[in-house]
């Protein structure tokens, strides 16, 4: 009789096949790098902490009939409670893919530079969040969990510092 090796359980786990991908799902999303000027005139960036404790920017799915710019504004309001904002420059697009059971999800996120206006201290995070906070720009860059968003944040900070804050179409 053959004795099982210590690796038999691992082999079974590794060799277990996932179901084949039966569909490709496209999920367009939009969000924003939200900033304000602190009392010392320093730039601060608003980050949210998701359910997995990763710091990121407010973003979400584009609804039917909605532009990416409108989505960015709506999602920022829903996720942060901020009502007054100025959606400025389009910073770029992030493509991300992941597997959801037997589907391949292709997510495209349009990111805008957004200036918070009015009372920016009255934040109302959604229930699923673990945190929401304004960070000095350098600290926000250290906290952000996603490299692609960090790159767009850097582009936004460059635009803020150069005064290149033209309104997008």
Predicted regions and their residues:
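Unchanged
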Residues: 62-151
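Short, acidic/hydrophobic/Gly-rich beta-strand patch recurrent on exposed beta strands
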Residues: 46-49
């Amino acid at each position: 009789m053959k004795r099982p090796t210590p690796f038999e359980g691992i082999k079974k786990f590794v060799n277990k096949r996932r179901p084949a991908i039966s569909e490709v799902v496209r999920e367009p999303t939009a969000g924003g790098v939200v900033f304000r000027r602190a009392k010392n005139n320093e730039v601060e960036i608003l980050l949210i902490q998701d359910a997995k404790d990763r710091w990121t920017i407010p973003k979400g799915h584009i609804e039917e009939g909605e532009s990416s710019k409108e989505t960015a504004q709506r999602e920022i309001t829903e996720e942060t409670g901020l009502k007054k904002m100025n959606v400025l420059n389009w910073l770029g697009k992030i493509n991300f893919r992941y597997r959801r059971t037997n589907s391949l999800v292709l997510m495209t996120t349009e990111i805008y530079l957004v200036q918070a206006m009015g009372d920016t201290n009255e934040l109302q995070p959604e229930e699923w969040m673990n945190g929401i906070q304004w960070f000095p720009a350098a600290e926000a860059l250290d906290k952000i969990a996603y490299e692609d968003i960090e790159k767009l944040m850097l582009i936004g900070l460059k635009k803020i510092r150069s005064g290149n804050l033209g309104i997008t179409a």
